C-alpha cells in the first residue's frame, strides 16, 4: 500500500543487512501476518541469487516480492557482477512499467561489496558507512528498530552475523509483525 506522499508504507516484516570487515549478512524474520493474525512463523524472506553471489530479502506482498526477485535475477543475468546496474535497471522498470508499479514490496539486496534498498518509487539507496565502520540497511515494519540496534552494535567487537542476529532479536521484541525465527545468509 502507498500513502498519500507516494512513498511505500513499511510492511509487516523485518529484513536487515550488515556489512563489516569484508563480511556481508542479510537476515530476515519468518513471520507472515494477515492483519492482526499470524498465519506462518517460518517463512523464508531471504534468498540467494546469481549463483550465490547475491542475497536478497523482501518486505511486502509475497507474490509481488517474488515477481521482483525474478525480475532482479533476469537483470543480474543481463548484467553479471554489476549489482548496482541491475538494481537501477530494475528500479527504472518498476517505476515506469504500468504493471510493475502496482507491486507492493521492497527489496534489500547485497553482494560482497555493496548493499542496496530498492523501492517501487524508483529509489536505489546505498547506505553510507556507519561511524563505527561497516554499513547497515533495513526494511519492513521492524526495520527502524533493527537498523538502530545494528548501528549501536557496529563498533563493538562482533561479526556482521552476530550484529545482525542481535539487532533482529531486538526488533522482534519491539515489533509485533516480526518474530525471532531468522533466516540468515552470509557472503
From Swiss-Prot:
Regulation of protein activity: Allosterically activated by HslU binding.
Active site positions: 13
GO cellular component terms given for this protein: HslUV protease complex; proteasome core complex
Catalyzed reaction equations: ATP-dependent cleavage of peptide bonds with broad specificity
Major localisation: cytoplasm
InterPro entries noted in UniProt: ATP-dep_Prtase_HsIV_su, Ntn_hydrolases_N, Proteasome_sua/b, Proteasome_suB-type
Subcellular location: Cytoplasm
A molecular function (GO) term: metal ion binding
Positions of Na(+) binding: 172, 175, 178
Disulfide bonds: none
Coiled coil: none
EC number: 3.4.25.2
Subunit text: A double ring-shaped homohexamer of HslV is capped on each side by a ring-shaped HslU homohexamer. The assembly of the HslU/HslV complex is dependent on binding of ATP.
Protein name: ATP-dependent protease subunit HslV
Organism, as annotated: Caulobacter sp. (strain K31)
Amino acid at each position: 500500500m502507498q500513502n498519500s506522499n507516494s512513498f511505500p508504507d513499511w510492511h509487516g516484516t523485518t529484513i536487515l543487512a550488515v556489512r563489516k570487515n569484508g563480511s556481508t549478512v542479510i537476515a530476515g524474520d519468518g513471520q507472515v501476518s494477515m492483519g492482526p493474525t499470524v498465519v506462518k512463523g517460518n517463512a523464508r524472506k531471504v534468498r540467494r541469487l546469481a549463483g550465490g553471489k547475491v542475497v536478497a530479502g523482501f518486505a511486502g506482498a509475497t507474490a509481488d516480492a517474488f515477481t521482483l526477485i525474478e525480475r532482479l535475477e533476469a537483470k543480474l543475468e543481463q548484467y553479471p557482477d554489476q549489482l548496482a546496474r541491475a538494481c537501477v535497471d530494475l528500479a527504472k522498470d518498476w517505476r515506469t512499467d504500468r504493471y510493475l508499479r502496482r507491486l507492493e514490496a521492497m527489496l534489500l539486496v547485497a553482494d560482497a561489496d555493496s548493499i542496496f534498498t530498492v523501492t517501487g518509487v524508483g529509489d536505489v539507496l546505498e547506505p553510507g558507512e556507519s561511524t563505527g565502520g561497516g554499513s547497515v540497511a533495513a526494511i519492513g515494519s521492524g526495520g527502524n528498530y533493527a537498523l538502530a540496534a545494528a548501528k549501536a552494535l557496529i563498533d563493538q567487537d562482533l561479526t556482521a552475523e552476530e550484529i545482525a542476529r542481535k539487532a533482529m532479536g531486538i526488533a522482534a521484541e519491539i515489533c509485533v509483525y516480526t518474530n525471532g525465527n531468522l533466516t540468515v545468509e552470509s557472503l
